[in-house]
């Protein structure tokens, strides 16, 4: 029986452990199962619960905490921290809204992190071992590995299966930097154990995790340097979005070192080589936000005739591995490493493995959102990807400052752009930069998933005044370009003068 620890050992972390890896838990003796799922994160839990709900005999294994990275070390604690940081930032903007604090906000970082741990323990209750067992799935805690093409072993217990799903997720990538030693840096798995605010924080990376936490710690009072070997922030998103976030970061006092490489660590100093040469950054804490790598080690995949590489478990479009009875889903096999994508692939795996379906993972419409302020949400094609795939597109765009609710809220920084297949209303992609982009983008995910054309968005009544009106206003741009199709619902007159007039379609 394995054990697990979290620091600090307060009531919240003890509760998280009790829920996700109960001390004294005794595994069953093994047996035969319709489905064995390796990994108790979001992917594995959805796969196991879906199969159990369908009446199948299911086992699920987990070496650490049920709930996996997302609820324990990723999405849940990071968003709790970001919310605290946004509250501090909003308080500092009081003069914009007609109030003034007699003294600057005093940040109690220990209380901030206590709230993060409390939120985590509350959220993880839904993924607790007992909760999983109540769905009918049988939980085995410990290290799982294949011993044959149809057998998984967990701490000496033999689990024979008809089908299996590998859902072991991913681990933080640690770059090869001279002098970087384990225990001397933070990742997403250790940063939420902090109890004291680092006065000086260096963040390596330019993707979602690095950007989100760099901004959050800056707002909470740390001096922050962000180092990225890319020329822009969030390089997988549209360049304009990354540039907007760069400007916001610099306005908030983050020091950015883009196009720079971290080359050496020595006693609280990081040597960085960039366009202007090599310089040293002093820090009290060093956070790695350099991406993730699939967790394929120690599974003995060879014993099950499952092919894999450093990129993860190799699967076909149905998420089936080289062993036709074994599937893989989530971060360990799917390029889009997001919790929502992981859960979608889990459902697809179960449908294909146990119900005889042939659903393709390539059919999934997978969005993503980076929870900076403003947030950056994207779905489908960008212009660069459209060119790579040979898809001709039309572009319809609106600045958020021209949406009345956005400037009323003081959240006008951002924009929305929708791409359609050239000459049609078929939506093939969209980017939204807005304070609440993650909440708003689902309208376009729905339209793309169900192939709803842009003219239907134009016809759909949206509540006024809301920031989500940005999509209808863009859709009305499109409708106005259709020859002989001036819509009877009309293009609403702009309010506030030129500030919120629609921009012409490109």
Kindly give the residue locations of the regions a language model identified.
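Glycine-rich flavin
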Residues: 2-33, 50-56, 61-197, 230-234, ...
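Rossmann-like NAD(P)H-binding beta-loop-alpha module
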Residues: 195-237, 338
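Flexible, glycine-rich terminal cap/loop adjacent to redox cofactors
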Residues: 7-10, 38-43, 47-64, 76, ...
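A Rossmann-like FAD-binding core segment of flavoenzymes
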Residues: 101-102, 138-141, 145-153, 159, ...
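FAD-site-proximal beta/loop scaffold in flavoenzymes
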Residues: 181-198, 280-355, 458
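Beta1/beta-strand and adjacent pyrophosphate-binding region of the FAD-binding site
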Residues: 26-43, 197-207
